[in-house]
From Swiss-Prot:
This is Chaperone protein HscC. It comes from the Bacteria. Signal peptide: none annotated. One of its GO terms (molecular function) is heat shock protein binding. Probable chaperone. Has ATPase activity. Not stimulated by DnaJ. InterPro entries: ATPase_NBD, Heat_shock_70_CS, HscC_NBD, HSP70_peptide-bd_sf, Hsp_70_fam. PANTHER family: HEAT SHOCK PROTEIN 70KDA (PTHR19375).
Length: 556
């Protein structure tokens, strides 16, 4: 088997990321350097300007929030930057560091280089967000041969073991995004009927709202907490939220005082009601677009870590009147599905034939002038149209002596183009005829997100423009410069990561503690630093073990 035949799938998540491979007739998760499947999507820079990715960076959100970045997937497609130490990074660059770490883990596990991968993205990601995802892959030295929608990837993993004709709804609530997809299984075909979503609704929003309520109950203004204190509070609230206990008990520190509060289920439901109601909107839209009622859904598939929150599950059960399908881990199924799609793409001999039909999750069209009103959006391909697809609409020039037209291509669902996303703009020259001219504009869209626009004029000439999701927003030189800069960054040595992660955990505990407890942890840190400086690994292991027992810390 040569390198090109490796079927690799990646779930590049807001909170955690995973990588999987199709191997020995099944999709398998690849462990990271800590033997874990979930790699936190967090980047930090230490005092020696080493980049820390994943678990070693988690604790530094509390101890060094000014040098740590998280939730950057939410900024894909924007101009947001993060400053870590003396360096500045954008969302694709930070994402590329996560992808690079996953790539190294896979190459270590498989003992072979990898290049071509299938990467999952939220179904409702815009064209620009998809471009940034491809750019992140390129900066990491990977080739994203396919971007697969996250609910569709989950359906691939679920559908591979579903030998029956069923209609399913995939409810995908991750750390930062929410997607709903309605599918139908008719072996061996998986047909996507409709998708809807909210790119700014996820588990982090529930955490943020809970933090605000904790501060309100304590009569503490958010502005009185420094970055480290606020990060420590977020960590406490997130841990309590993920415990799914009832009542939810939160214990945190403020100005050398321990604060505690409890939230009962009815209180959480009242608090989170605005977010829970937002979950209904994409569900109702997807069902409406698929022309189905909740009672016509045969199975409910929950995906994403936040979908495991009891109140979220209760909302889903109320809407559909049935319990969710539970025979998989919702945090890992997307990566497995991406690997299955990669295997299907390579036509691996040891995989059953699976035919996937997907949809365009958003409407694509052009800007027109109607009755003297400019800036009107005219859809050519409506949202949730099965792809590949080709559609044509006929338009007319605005003036008899018009010598050119500007084709502004937009995506979105708003009547006004100013509220949609501009995808591309180009001019088409016309021959003056002294009369109004009829113009046909054809959109052809394929499963890889490639859009071809054909403008057919009255004289029979055609002007074509191909719009794809390659990172065209940067020049080849700019991409190469960014790749070179990222490659020059010093990634913390793999063989020392366990000790670095343990040190970060000690620093996090010190940042949270107060008084005598803080002093004791400080002494432990001093002992551990001295052991590290001695380069005596036996001594390092012994100090780490004693510190772990004394402070009840899990050794990574």
């Amino acid at each position: 088997m040569d390198n090109a035949e490796l079927a690799i799938g990646i779930d590049l998540g807001t909170t955690n990321s995973l990588i999987a491979v199709w191997k020995d007739g099944a999709a398998q998760l690849i462990p990271n350097k800590f033997g874990e499947y979930l790699t936190p999507s967090i980047i930090s820079m230490d005092e020696n300007n080493h980049i820390l990715v994943g678990k070693p960076a988690v604790s530094r959100r509390t101890s060094h929030p000014d040098k740590t970045a998280a939730l950057f997937k939410r900024a894909m497609g924007s101009n947001t930057n993060w400053r870590l130490g003396s360096d500045t990074f954008n969302a694709p660059e930070l994402s590329s560091l996560v992808l690079r770490s996953l790539k190294e883990d896979a190459e270590e596990f498989l003992q072979r280089p990898i290049k071509d991968v299938v990467i999952s993205v939220p179904a409702y990601f815009s064209d620009e967000q998809r471009k940034h995802t491809r750019l992140a892959a390129e900066l990491a030295g990977l080739n994203a041969v396919r971007l697969i929608n996250e609910p569709t990837a989950a359906a691939m993993a679920y559908g591979l073991h579903t030998q029956q004709n069923t209609r399913s709804l995939v409810f995908d609530l991750g750390g930062g995004t929410f997607d709903v997809t309605v599918l139908e299984y008719a072996t061996p075909v998986i047909e996507v009927h409709a998708s809807a979503g909210d790119n700014f609704l996820g588990g982090e929003d529930f955490t943020h709202m809970l933090v605000d309520e904790v501060l309100k109950r304590a009569d503490v203004a958010r502005t009185t907490l420094n970055e480290s204190e606020l990060a420590a509070l977020y960590a406490c609230v997130e841990a309590a939220k993920c415990s799914n206990q009832s009542p939810l008990h939160i214990r945190w520190q403020y100005q050398e005082e321990t604060r505690e509060c409890e939230f009962y289920e009815n209180e959480l439901e009242d608090l989170w009601l605005p977010l829970l109601n937002r979950l209904r909107v994409p569900i109702e839209q997807a069902l409406r677009d698929a022309r189905l009622k909740p009672s016509q859904i045969d199975s409910l598939v929950l995906v994403g870590g936040a979908s495991q929150m009891p109140l979220v599950q209760r909302i889903a059960v109320r809407l559909f009147g049935k319990l969710p399908y539970q025979s998989y881990d919702p945090s890992t199924i997307v990566a497995l599905g991406a690997a299955i799609q990669a295997a299907c793409r390579l036509r691996s001999e040891d995989i059953e034939e699976v035919i996937l039909t997907d949809i365009c999750p958003y409407s694509l069209g052009v800007e027109v002038n109607r009755q003297g009103v400019s800036g009107i959006f005219s859809p050519i391909i409506e949202r949730n149209t099965t792809v590949p697809v080709s559609r044509v609409e006929t338009y007319s020039t605005m003036h008899p002596e018009q010598d050119s037209i500007t084709v502004n291509v937009y995506q979105g669902e708003n009547h006004k183009v100013k509220n949609n996303i501009l995808v591309e703009s180009f001019d088409v020259p016309l021959k003056k005829t002294g009369a109004y001219q009829s113009i046909d504009i054809r959109f052809s869209y394929d499963i890889n997100g490639l859009l071809e626009v054909d403008v057919l004029l009255e004289d029979g000439s055609v002007k074509s423009r191909v719009i794809n999701h390659s990172p065209v927003t940067l020049s080849a030189q700019q991409i190469e410069e960014s790749r070179t800069r990222l490659s020059a960054l010093k990634i913390y040595p793999r063989d020392m990561l366990i000790n670095r992660t343990f040190k970060a955990k000690l620093e996090e505990l010190w940042a949270r503690a107060l008084g005598d407890e803080r002093e004791e942890i400080g002494r432990v840190i001093t002992d551990f630093d001295a052991a590290l400086q001695s380069n005596d690994m036996a001594r390092v292991d012994e100090v780490r073990r004693r510190a772990s027992d004394y402070l009840a810390i899990e050794i990574p």
